Amino acid sequence: MSGSKWFDKSLLLRDGVSLISRIWLPNSNGPWPALLMRQPYGREIASTITYSHPEWWVSKGYMVVIQDVRGMGASEGVFNGFKQEARDTSETHEWVRSLKECNGKLGLYGFSYQGFTQLTGELNSKPPDCLSPAMTGMNLSLIHI
């Protein structure tokens, strides 16, 4: 597949930690709706046989953002499992929506840990417009976020 461009971009969180995202854009005039995956396995997981390659989504008119969560991949900080995800997820949603390439619409996708990150966010934050979690077997009421 071709017809898209990608680049890495850093989000500086309020606590000073930097999260790294890889962003794919269509070769057409934006802004576009964004699809976001936040994950701990390295940004390259988004372009394996596990998921449709970001270029496929780009060919459908979406910008795609794949982010390494705190302390994993190229992102800074310490990975503490699920404890930091509500705050980091909310700040990431706000950041993606503020990017000049994004039209303000935000969808989330992924399974397992990537599914979990879709279900977190601070109570006072704006929710995503669409989400698609899968294989996320957890009881969120048992997690103290």
Residue ranges and their predicted role:
Residues T48-V65:
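Short amphipathic alpha-helix adjacent to the substrate-entry channel of hydrolases
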Residues G81-S98:
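Alpha/beta-hydrolase active-site loop
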Residues S47, G71-G81:
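Glycine-rich "HGGG/HGxG" loop immediately N-terminal to the catalytic nucleophile
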Residues E101-S112:
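Alpha/beta-hydrolase fold nucleophile elbow
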Residues I143-I145:
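Conserved small/polar residues in nucleotide/adenosyl-binding loops
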Residues G115-K126:
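Short glycine-enriched nucleophile-adjacent loop
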Residues M1-S28:
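N-terminal cap/lid segment of alpha/beta-hydrolase-fold proteins
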Residues P31-P40:
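Short beta-strand element of the alpha/beta-hydrolase
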